[in-house]
Curated annotation (Swiss-Prot):
Binding site for Zn(2+): C146, C149, C159, C162
Entry cofactors: Zn(2+)
Function: Is required not only for elongation of protein synthesis but also for the initiation of all mRNA translation through initiator tRNA(fMet) aminoacylation.
Keywords noted in UniProt: Aminoacyl-tRNA synthetase, ATP-binding, Cytoplasm, Ligase, Metal-binding, Nucleotide-binding, Protein biosynthesis, RNA-binding, tRNA-binding, Zinc
Protein known as: Methionine--tRNA ligase
Catalytic reactions on record: tRNA(Met) + L-methionine + ATP = L-methionyl-tRNA(Met) + AMP + diphosphate
Gene transcribed to yield this protein: metG
Enzyme class: ligase
Gene3D superfamilies: HUPs, Isoleucyl-tRNA Synthetase, Domain 1, Methionyl-tRNA synthetase, Zn-domain, Nucleic acid-binding proteins
Cofactor comment text: Binds 1 zinc ion per subunit.
Amino acid sequence: MTQVAKKILVTCALPYANGSIHLGHMLEHIQADVWVRYQRMRGHEVNFICADDAHGTPIMLKAQQLGITPEQMIGEMSQEHQTDFAGFNISYDNYHSTHSEENRQLSELIYSRLKENGFIKNRTISQLYDPEKGMFLPDRFVKGTCPKCKSPDQYGDNCEVCGATYSPTELIEPKSVVSGATPVMRDSEHFFFDLPSFSEMLQAWTRSGALQEQVANKMQEWFESGLQQWDISRDAPYFGFEIPNAPGKYFYVWLDAPIGYMGSFKNLCDKRGDTTSFDEYWKKDSTAELYHFIGKDIVYFHSLFWPAMLEGSNFRKPTNLFVHGYVTVNGAKMSKSRGTFIKASTWLNHFDADSLRYYYTAKLSSRIDDIDLNLEDFVQRVNADIVNKVVNLASRNAGFINKRFDGVLASELADPQLYKTFTDAAEVIGEAWESREFGKAIREIMALADLANRYVDEQAPWVVAKQEGRDADLQAICSMGINLFRVLMTYLKPVLPKLTERAEAFLNTELTWHGIQQPLLGHKVNPFKALYNRIDMKQVEALVEASKEEVKAAATPVTGPLADDPIQETITFDDFAKVDLRVALIENAEFVEGSDKLLRLTLDLGGEKRNVFSGIRSAYPDPQALIGRHTIMVANLAPRKMRFGISEGMVMAAGPGGKDIFLLSPDAGAKPGHQVK
């Protein structure tokens, strides 16, 4: 059946430009690339684009930490990201940046249209402000306890445990991620996108049946809890685009980040000198298809804010969102200490890209399920499937064809019915690729590979080769095996681009989806060269060890107090619980005759007096100034006999020593005898 060629625009979520690409990122880019390559094989016009997400406070602060400009940092990171994606043969037509003139113009255009249409609201809000750093704190730079499920250590915009979204001011016991200080509240005028105005449209889009069931169900929960206006502005200092006619106010990174899809495509059109495609793909009534491959952690932004922004600014909405789960390694979250937090570049130093592309593909489905990269299973599956079943099929037949028949295949098929079984599978396998049921496609292909190898085993060309007068049979059997290999590699072409190149060189023909309907008859193949090498666990061990070493090398050198006075060995809670810390009032403080380091302190523990010798004289040359001050002491320390008398405890102080000793004091209201817990 002839397919009508479609116009398709495909995007992956934009990697953030403050860190390297790792194997978790690669799941999405591989999934999208396999789907895109299949669409291209079927004759569709596909534009596959991405960009770096290059704005926000994290980038600003990291650049400061590195002593370079944000522009320099994101430029270097973009080159690294593009090198990694090229190494994994991700076939992007364009890779751009949100820090671009195209993105600035489109962000301002969408904002102005939303404002003209009454969807931008101004109001003064109270924000968390870091008093130590002198800056308002973005959502991701505040952590605290989730106000909904009470999970600790959650960011200021959404909870990674229950998925709830909220304002940073709703966090329980918030702390600044930048300085560790407790934020204070300050007022600031902000701009809000009126998301609730689009509730009806979004619910209709949800019910259209296009979205994954899990996404639609999650969206329904959000509708039931009520949509809120969305804060789209941030205060200076901020690295991003300044909002027109609003000095000191910047677009929130999540406003201009998805617009980066449009910016990258506009950049591609401009490079091509194409003045019509941008409008053709993005206009309100566009018939082109638009798909976003994203992770489950950013569904909220892509399923609510993004389509509403597009609707409100008179652009088309996505055709669908293709959402995937996370990657675990060996059944657990990726870990730097275990060496399973693996960068894309590190992987390519130890394995080829096709191996990971195959393993991920074999495990992917259209559902939002997490994928486990079990490294032992990875080795076994790559060897069993790619090497033993597919590549071996070619190698065990090619030798006879090259040596005995000068590389020329038979003029007729030895088993036309078996070949038809292989080509008839194109519909089922194609539908699996189309619907992103990648694991099913691989299972179907490997079942065919088993059939092909069974055929060769039964025909035993190595036996036939020794029998006189059976040259025609030998040529027919081996030609059949090579033709079946060709069909298998055609089905696997979206997954294994580098192996496909080598297979095409051997077969002396391009692999096309429609081409398999005609077998290679009387066709000359090239001399066979090894197509793929087996892998082993030693490579895995080297990969893990290299990842550990990279973490050590990348560790930020410790500076300041920790460099001179490292944190001591970890103790248990039971050990700590033995220490009884109490608030004490300094009733008297005096020099100790015969010592140039000690002060004698008389402490009131709320009904009990203690005599303590403390080596703080260098920092407190006037002991009388300490009288009447509250401090903290270790109350259950065994008395220590000294030359000057008995010391009945220890007062708590911080600092490196000398003049830099700082006696600790409790907050106002604490009374002598209060226990420190």
